[in-house]
Amino acid sequence: MARNTGPLCKLCRREGMKLYLKGERCFSEKCPFDKRPFAPGQHGREKKKLTQYALQLRAKQTMKRIYGVLEKQFRIYYERAVKQSGDTRENLVAQVERRLDNVVYRLGFAINRRAARQLVSHGHVLVNGKKVDIPSYQVRPGDVISIKEGSRTIEPIKQAIELNKGRAISNWLEVDYDQFKGVYVRNPKLEEIIDLPVNVQAIVEFYSR
């Protein structure tokens, strides 16, 4: 399965909800989902009663699309979550939240996760002072994430910071925009992820069948 490079708004319509894949645009009047909040295609307006399996599948697909993760990697995250002690749901959420591209987005250095992935892939991001260009890199509590000094004048980064200055960031993070750096303080708790419109328990049930 290749990474989806098509129109992001179609993914929101397919899932029947806003996935906020385009960042600030999703909150504006220009958001296409507000005009056509139904699935694309000839039968997109038809409402179907979904089976339990279908609901579980949709939950999994939705979470994968929000974080931009492919099936093989997502299953690995689930298998790790099961092996860890504690709540499997919370462990699974922590696996995707610890992705470097997600942390860069959460810190406000990019307007969305796709843009954050590009920043990481192009070598603009440092972890504990060393360049890491792997978007799926797992950040650990205490890690310092920063923008490389030579990349701090890049317009998309400056725009993202200007947009996010003054906004509250996630409780498990700390950020200093003047220094272009932030800290991944701890793993988040499930109830703290307020922008994840997914029944994570349904995903656990899907994989545990």
Swiss-Prot record:
Give any single GO term for biological process. Answer: ribosomal small subunit biogenesis
Keyword terms of this UniProt record: Ribonucleoprotein, Ribosomal protein, RNA-binding, rRNA-binding
* CDD domains reported for this sequence: S4
Tell whether RNA-binding is among the UniProt keywords: yes
Cited SMART domains: Ribosomal_S4, S4
The family line of this record is: Belongs to the universal ribosomal protein uS4 family.
Q: What does this protein do?
A: One of the primary rRNA binding proteins, it binds directly to 16S rRNA where it nucleates assembly of the body of the 30S subunit. With S5 and S12 plays an important role in translational accuracy.
Instruction: Spell out the NCBIfam families in the cross-references.
Output: PRK05327.1, rpsD_bact
Q: What is this protein called?
A: Small ribosomal subunit protein uS4
Task: Recall the taxonomic lineage recorded for the source organism.
Answer: Bacteria, Thermotogati, Thermotogota, Thermotogae, Thermotogales
In the UniProt record, the gene name given for this protein reads rpsD
